[in-house]
Each structure stands twice: as C-alpha cells, then as structure tokens.
C-alpha cells in the first residue's frame, strides 16, 4: 500500500498525520498526491466553496519591513497611499460583491495596527454593513489589542485575519520589525474575543517545503478555520523583486500537503493566481475549497464572475 493511500485512510478515520508522516509524502507523485488531497477535501468538507473578496481600506506608509510588501515605507514602490476609506466606499464595495454571489468581505488595512480613532471609524462602518447587507464580515487590521478586537466583534465582524506568512524559523528572514509571537498572540486574542480565524501565508519567499510544512502544523495547533495560501508575485522596489516564481508543480504540491495536514479547514487560494497558467484551475483540484476573488491589495486579481464560472465547472457549490 502506498503512503498516499495509507495516510488518506488514516485521515478519513479521524486521525491527524505527524510531521514525519507528512515528510514521507514529499517524494510521492504530485498528480496522485493532488487527486488524493481532493478526495480528502470532498469526503470531509463536501463540495461547498467559500468565496471572499477584499478591499484595501488603508494603503501604504506601513512602518513594518516585510520584504515582499509594496506597502512598506521602507521600500520605494509605486503605490497609491491613503488613509481609511470612507464608509460609503467600503459599503458600496461590500454590497456589490454580495450581489455577485460572494460569501465574505474583508477590509484590509496597512500598518502594524489601527489606532483608536481608526477602529472607531471602521466599527461604525461594520455596524452599518451588518444592518444593510447579509455578507459575512471579516477584518484584517494588524496586531490589535484584545479590547479593540472585542469592539470589532461587537460591530458584526465574525472572522479575523492575521497571516503567519511563513515558518517561525524563516520569519526573521522576511521581517524584523515585529515577531512571530506577536502574530500568535494576536490570533489567540482574536479567538478569545470570539472570532473565527483566517491565517496562512505566502509561498515562494525563498523558504523550503519544510518551512511550509512547519507553518501548516503551527496553524493546526492554533485551530484556525481558514488558511489563505498566497503565491508571491514579486513587486518592483521590494527586496524580493527578483525572487524566482515558484513552479506550478511546487504550488500544487504545497496545497495538497496542506490538505493532508489540515483535513477539515478551508484552504483558500489567495493572491498570485494571475501569474500561473490557468488562473488556478489545477490548484483548485488539489484539496482547495476557498478562494479570494477580484483584485488583491496592490495587484490585480481575477474577475469574480469568471471565478464563479470556473469554480462551478469544477463541481463546487458556490
């Protein structure tokens, strides 16, 4: 019996794989690995697909030095900078996306964390949205304190996003202005405040497959509900502008392994799909059951209507 079949049976019996068992899958055929990851997804998660969109609610001038990010003030990138968007702009975007068939909507803001006035402003917007539209609200506002997280929760936000980005070991190679434990503390505080958690990372930063596996196990320990997987789209002006883009095989292998490690979570194909050949179609058949649609924060994405058509053609329910 191959390791793929053996470990599929173990997972479907309700057990979790160890890191050593996952490492045994590294040399398996990628096509078989992806197909089996998809079978695990279908057995444990069904065919329901979770589709979300984001809006860049505050852009640029970030004091953090994440090497991949166009919004860092440490690097010379050609992006538009602005403070918190007004309520009407955010609400119009949320309602428009809801009418297109999107399930979730997230406001994402640059910077280490919002200040009190910014939290106040967005809480008012979230309350208005909750009263106006049935789209599920998510938020990504950095390393907030518990008290601010609780205010967001009380305003109608149901899921908080904070990416680990990579493994603990590799993190200091991409960011030195905050610590891995700052992220974990924020995630734990968000859970304490009553949020579901969306946390994943970026692949293609120069990390190894071992780093990706380590990150996935940390996410499993944190019991997150949604794991967005971004593919680095190198931005001119950042230290990673010349980083080699991952092969599609490496992307598919990573997604499939994540399903073996995280059998019941939403694995969400996120930024970077425009740089791969089929806009993520094969990736969506590798254990994935969620995606971010539309434009990303500082890069173009894929039109939502095009995404929904592709997702339905693959047999998912949107």
Swiss-Prot record:
Residues engaged in binding [2Fe-2S] cluster: 106, 138, 198, 268
GO terms for MF: 2 iron, 2 sulfur cluster binding; 4 iron, 4 sulfur cluster binding; biotin synthase activity; iron ion binding
Cofactor note: Binds 1 [4Fe-4S] cluster. The cluster is coordinated with 3 cysteines and an exchangeable S-adenosyl-L-methionine.
Pfam families, alphabetized: BATS (PF06968), Radical_SAM (PF04055)
Catalytic activity, EC: 2.8.1.6
Keyword Metal-binding: yes
Keyword Metal-binding recorded: yes
UniProt pathway annotation: Cofactor biosynthesis; biotin biosynthesis; biotin from 7,8-diaminononanoate: step 2/2
Amino acids binding [4Fe-4S] cluster: 62, 66, 69
One example of a Gene Ontology biological process annotation: biotin biosynthetic process
Disulfide bonds: none
Quaternary structure note: Homodimer.
Function: Catalyzes the conversion of dethiobiotin (DTB) to biotin by the insertion of a sulfur atom into dethiobiotin via a radical-based mechanism.
Family: Belongs to the radical SAM superfamily. Biotin synthase family.
Annotated protein name in UniProt: Biotin synthase
Organism, as annotated: Clostridium botulinum (strain Okra / Type B1)
């Amino acid at each position: 019996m191959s390791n793929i079949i053996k470990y599929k049976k173990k997972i479907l019996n309700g057990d979790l794989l160890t890191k050593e068992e996952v490492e045994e899958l590294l040399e398996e055929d990628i096509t078989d690995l992806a197909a089996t990851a998809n079978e695990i997804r279908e057995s444990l998660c069904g065919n329901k697909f979770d589709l979300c969109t984001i809006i860049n609610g505050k852009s640029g001038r970030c004091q953090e030095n994440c090497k991949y990010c166009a919004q860092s003030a440490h690097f010379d990138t050609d992006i538009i900078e602005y403070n918190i968007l007004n309520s009407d702009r955010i609400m119009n975007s949320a309602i428009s996306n809801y009418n297109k068939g999107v399930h979730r909507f997230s406001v994402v803001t640059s910077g280490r964390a919002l200040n009190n006035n910014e939290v106040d402003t967005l809480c008012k917007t979230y309350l208005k949205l909750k009263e106006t539209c049935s789209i599920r609200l998510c938020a990504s506002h950095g390393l907030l304190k518990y008290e601010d997280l609780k205010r967001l929760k009380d305003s109608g936000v149901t899921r908080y996003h904070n990416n680990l980005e990579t493994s603990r070991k590799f993190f200091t190679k991409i960011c030195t202005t905050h610590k891995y434990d700052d992220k974990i503390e924020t995630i734990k505080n968000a859970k304490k405040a009553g949020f579901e958690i969306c946390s994943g990372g970026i692949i293609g930063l120069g990390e190894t497959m071992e780093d990706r596996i380590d990150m996935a196990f940390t996410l499993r320990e944190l019991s997150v509900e949604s794991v967005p997987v971004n593919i680095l789209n190198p931005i001119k002006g950042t230290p990673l502008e010349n980083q080699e883009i991952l092969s599609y095989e490496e992307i598919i292998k990573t997604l499939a392994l994540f399903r073996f490690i995280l059998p019941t979570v939403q694995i969400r194909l996120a930024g970077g799909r425009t740089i791969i050949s089929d806009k993520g179609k094969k990736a969506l058949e590798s254990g994935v059951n969620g995606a971010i649609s539309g434009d990303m924060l500082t890069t173009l994405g894929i039109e939502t209507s095009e995404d929904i058509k592709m997702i339905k053609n693959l047999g998912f329910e949107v």
